[in-house]
């Protein structure tokens, strides 16, 4: 077995100069392929990009300005700009083919952008800086890409050696403890469930103590229990100060984990906190249900504080557009009581992040059909 490990390490060393590239499945960094070149970053004012929280000394952990990638005539993504603060969990959402994974590969120095500029872990994204950037980041791809006949420890040891970090054995032990896999260290990866393999892949991504961690669909194909385990690990990483760039199709996952989210559909459609995006896209509403229809709903709902309008939805349901539900709800309740209405329920309508996502993606589809 030890000879197999040595052979694998030697082969990996010949194939790549960086663990990040080794994880990509490519023989060489794309920065050297097909004549592609990075665009020299241009200086911009701090106000030109959308900022995140937790920035240290005004410098974001990760930023992009007008970043784009084309493959011939096909646009993978275009004109993407954002700033992500240190220790922020940033969700990157979008339909299949929107450019999410290509964005991760670009920011991770695995392929070169064709337009725009970026900084990763505080370093400008240029050909000369690729190696230094990869020392500060890790990428966990959607597919774990483990050596199934090797044990968990042997898999991690291969990559710890590639990082050429001091005390690789200690790093492997620490990574195993971080993902709660110390008791499975000697198990062959081929014997593990998909959820446990994802945890091994996450442990591998932590071997170099990354400042920025890219997680590409980390819970894809996992059952709810395994996905919850990954969520708890992400929460722990957030508390330790790691900046996390998370792509996912699970909108409830993004809503639970992310400080802010961006929705990409080739171009960036929106960016912000989930609550702020809901407020921007949807009016706040109160829904009232009565036992019998109101005889004069217009009089009942007239001139109430923070109530901007109303409509009847069926025989006994009334939907009120409100600017502030905490002010409107008591006023609406008093008005209904004074009118002698038998109220069955009154409550605020809540829109989910999925509602925001579908609204924006449907807008794009309608625009294409015009």
Place the predicted regions along the sequence by residue.
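Conserved ABC transporter NBD signature motif
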Residues: 116-125, 133
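Conserved catalytic motifs of ABC-family nucleotide-binding domains
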Residues: 209
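Short, charged/small-residue-rich alpha-helical element at the C-terminal edge
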Residues: 11, 283-360, 370
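Catalytic Walker B motif of ABC-type/P-loop ATPase nucleotide-binding domains
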Residues: 213-216
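Conserved ABC ATPase "signature" region
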Residues: 138, 157, 161-184
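ABC transporter nucleotide-binding domain
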Residues: 231-323
